[in-house]
């Protein structure tokens, strides 16, 4: 999964040209030397198109296909597998006191709605992955509730992606400030969910 635009809390959107400049040579290099599937992490259709031309074969949109209205039709046209993620707000403001009445229901309803939208647009359900969006517009309590209850989201009927690798939640749980030192905590969180069916980890 290759991305050129930071989506960490507080990060600002960069231009399409800059995002393409960052990812295109990397994807081209990898695809020329390996048959490994490459996913592009982007919210923008023009970036996804450039990545596809360079060798990417999947789109991972952290906005859940709400940022660029042209991206969904493009993915449908190219028959690309997709990952749809829940986030609340944009990276620059998503951690400004996020609130939910019921985090499980609200995230589930969003993902269910977006999955149905993807299917209606022509993307087969078996080509869709759902991501609960750990750290995207959620505080520690929200994140822990989602992680502990991730089996709830199997009701969506698609594989689930649990992305916790080196995120700040590991620091808040284990007091590991340097992201480079959070790998053990990341593995521990993922390991506790290994018995769940159709769950992917990043």
Locations of regions flagged by a protein language model:
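Hydrophobic faces of well-ordered beta-strands that scaffold small-molecule active sites
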Residues: 2, 38-40, 59-60, 82-84, ...
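Glycine-rich, proline-tolerant flexible connector loops at the mouths of alpha/beta enzymes
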Residues: 1-22, 134
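Active-site beta-loop-alpha junctions enriched in small/polar residues
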Residues: 5-7, 43-45, 62-64, 87-88, ...
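Alpha-helix-loop-beta-strand connector modules within alpha/beta enzyme cores
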Residues: 13-38, 78, 150-160
């Amino acid at each position: 999964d290759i991305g050129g635009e930071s989506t960490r809390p507080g990060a600002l959107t960069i231009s399409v040209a800059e995002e393409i400049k960052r990812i295109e040579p990397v994807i081209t290099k990898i695809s020329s030397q390996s048959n490994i599937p490459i996913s592009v992490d982007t919210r923008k259709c023009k970036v996804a198109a450039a990545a596809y031309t360079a060798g990417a074969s999947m789109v991972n949109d952290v906005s859940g296909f709400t940022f660029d209205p042209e991206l969904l039709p493009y993915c449908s046209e190219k028959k690309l597998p997709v990952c749809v993620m829940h986030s609340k707000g944009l990276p620059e403001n998503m951690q400004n006191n996020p609130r939910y009445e019921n985090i499980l229901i609200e995230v589930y309803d969003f993902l269910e709605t977006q999955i149905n939208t993807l299917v209606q647009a022509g993307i087969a359900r078996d080509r869709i992955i759902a991501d609960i969006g750990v750290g995207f517009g959620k505080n520690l309590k929200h994140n822990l509730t989602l992680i502990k209850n991730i089996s709830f989201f199997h009701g969506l009927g698609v594989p689930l992606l649990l992305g916790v690798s080196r995120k700040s939640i590991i620091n808040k749980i284990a007091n590991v400030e340097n992201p480079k030192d959070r790998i053990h905590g990341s593995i521990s969180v993922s390991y506790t969910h290994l018995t769940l069916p159709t769950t992917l980890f990043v």
